[in-house]
Amino acid sequence: MTWLSRDTVPTGTGFLRLSPAADVAVPLSSADLAATVELSRETFAAAGITATDRVVVALNSDGDLAGAVLTQALTGLAGATASVGPRGRMRLLAALDAVGATALVITPTGAADLLARLHMEFLVDPLDLGLRTLILVGEITDQRTCRHLAAEFGARVIGVYVDPVFGAALAWRDATDERNPLSPVRDGLLALADLAEDAVLAAAPGKSAELVLTPVWHSTLGDATIRTGEVVDLSADSAGIPAPTHTVGDHVLIRGRWLSLPRLRAVLAKIDGIAQWTLEIRRDGTLDVATLKVAFARPSLLKNPMWHGRVRQAVAAVTPVTIKVEVLPEVSETSAPPVIDDRRGHHLGSDRHGR
């Protein structure tokens, strides 16, 4: 058994699935891609999607959340499918109407933001959309949000686990009850591992464990165990594999996208004059908000638009997620290591061994 993380997956040859920052390149042969689609189709079928459903997929089609792959999996299972991308709630509303959608695949914060805009901007009753099923993917969410979405839309709220390496939908659950474990569509796809050592856990009540992939269906990585960076909390009465509640390692999850912290550190290290920086992540409203707080080492840089622009461009080069850059008003005379300040309480840190 070979233990890997996303950073150490061999690049291989043929078609490569790239992350948005191109820091992860996973080989997917034609057979692997077909297996990814078939696994996802089986998962959606197990979650209750049938030929009577008309599905809109409001996800990105690159990297972490492969909306195009999930749409392909739904095609032939549902009566109709459409992929519209994640941006533009008014456009999404128009797409739901045009398709006559009964099911929507979206991130939890995307669904919450759509709901807020329906009430405050569009003056549309969510019940009038006629959605029977909300399929939430790609983010850590809570039972209260899922129950609120279910009540407002009058719909089933299903959580589908899409793995961050291959982009396959592997498991599902009723998301309105946090006690409901993930139900993998096949045996042997998911497992739990110790955070500090390469060992699969049979049971570990009262501990945290990392969700790992065992992609037996993959042509070249079938004997690997791949760490996902997603962490579950195991209570004394945990049954099966719970939904992830935290992240760990060198990637942090923001708006359903994985940000590579080593890449961010590397590009900011090339900008002369940065003494220290903090990446602050919040979820005060419906969406994640990320702010990079930068302290410069020289007074001349505090109001230098060119230097501020360099920081913004560096951040934009490593992630499609919008990250606001805030220059602190005072000079920092001492350098300090970068800080990840996750106010959501999701990210446990880069060091697995310290957990």
Positions of predicted regions on the chain:
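Active-site diphosphate/adenylate-binding microenvironment
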Residues: M1-A35, L39
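Short, flexible loop segments at the rims of nucleotide/cofactor-binding pockets, characterized by
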Residues: D32-A35, A80-V84
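Active-site glycine/GP-rich loop and adjacent strand/helix microenvironment
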Residues: V84-R355
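Short acidic, glycine/Ser/Thr-rich loop/turn "cap" segments at secondary-structure junctions
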Residues: V26-L28, T52-L59, L92-L93, G100-A103
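Redox-cofactor binding/interface segments in oxidoreductases and associated redox assembly factors
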Residues: G14-F15, V57, I106, L136
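A short helix-loop-beta submotif of the ANL/AMP-binding
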Residues: Q72-A82, T102
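Conserved AMP-binding loop of ANL adenylate-forming enzymes
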Residues: E38-A73
